[in-house]
């Protein structure tokens, strides 16, 4: 008799995705982040669901309801901080996952990569709307500043912003719809994750060498299930350390002040994981130009397969390209730092140079470096 996991229509899908899936024998710990992202999504959906049971999306009570969750609901404080810091952990895993994809040429699986870029946009939208919900000062002013960027769109901009706001400013209607979308989007993300996996399993995983590994595959279970469990343990430990020892480390103190439309905070800035894009936005003096640069800083990822000029897929054996990659990482860290600084000298010029370097590296320097390497290898 055939094993039920191989014959049952539902179990067969799970079996082919997580148990009997052929996987390259040499994938490193950099391939752990996909499963870690799945765990992050599960944590976010579960903690978010329980938070939504006690949260009220009304401007008069939103801030108080979050305070009530932390003070009066059983283990409400841990739910709230798991959710807030879980988002940070989500983005850490997301950035590392994308970095792995860039380094090892995983973007050559175009469908998987493009769905991944759409996922990134969806996660960023969800995180932004979630940050508005506690209705603190940074929530209110962050929502005002970021939604206001749409007014830079010619002709329809102003109408579009007022349509999103549901009025003439960020108010009750805005908060209610942001809560609705913040609740809905994670389920759309979950559906996109399934599409992401569907495309991945069409081709199979890449591996550090970038060479096809069809001749040397091993079953996903038990080898990579146990490896993923170790990764999950380390990540959950890191998350719990953050939540239990310094839950407000990555947050903004201004968000403990209730939203006040009459009082602007000295430095309006988003959560740390958006700072690199925020720095690119601020480095261009023109409003529309800044918005375009902001969108292109993420959208540029879709061009990665087109910008791949090397004869090799992975950067594993390409030292010059490795230098360019780590320069890009350093540049993104610089942009993240600049995004959190006030708009004054010398931060303005540093931000502008880092923004130029970001686009220059991806569009010009990395493709040229790859061509140089091809010539050095006489390919």
UniProtKB/Swiss-Prot annotation:
Any single Pfam family the record assigns to this protein: Cytochrome_B
Residues given in the record as a ubiquinone binding sites: 201
Main location: mitochondrion
One Gene Ontology cellular component annotation held by this UniProt entry: respiratory chain complex III
GO terms classed as biological process: mitochondrial electron transport, ubiquinol to cytochrome c
Sites where the protein binds heme b b566: 97, 196
Cofactor list: heme b
Topological relation to the membrane, as annotated: Multi-pass membrane protein
Subcellular location(s) of the protein: Mitochondrion inner membrane
Keywords, in A-Z order: Electron transport, Heme, Iron, Membrane, Metal-binding, Mitochondrion, Mitochondrion inner membrane, Respiratory chain, Transmembrane, Transmembrane helix, Transport, Ubiquinone
Transmembrane feature ranges: 33-53, 77-98, 113-133, 178-198, 226-246, 288-308, 320-340, 347-367
Residues reported in the UniProt entry to bind heme b b562: 83, 182
Domain of life: Eukaryota
GO MF term set: metal ion binding; ubiquinol-cytochrome-c reductase activity
Misc remark: Heme 1 (or BL or b562) is low-potential and absorbs at about 562 nm, and heme 2 (or BH or b566) is high-potential and absorbs at about 566 nm.
Biological function: Component of the ubiquinol-cytochrome c reductase complex (complex III or cytochrome b-c1 complex) that is part of the mitochondrial respiratory chain. The b-c1 complex mediates electron transfer from ubiquinol to cytochrome c. Contributes to the generation of a proton gradient across the mitochondrial membrane that is then used for ATP synthesis.
Subunit structure: The cytochrome bc1 complex contains 11 subunits: 3 respiratory subunits (MT-CYB, CYC1 and UQCRFS1), 2 core proteins (UQCRC1 and UQCRC2) and 6 low-molecular weight proteins (UQCRH/QCR6, UQCRB/QCR7, UQCRQ/QCR8, UQCR10/QCR9, UQCR11/QCR10 and a cleavage product of UQCRFS1). This cytochrome bc1 complex then forms a dimer.
Family under the similarity heading: Belongs to the cytochrome b family.
Protein name: Cytochrome b
Taxonomy of the source species: Eukaryota, Metazoa, Chordata, Craniata, Vertebrata
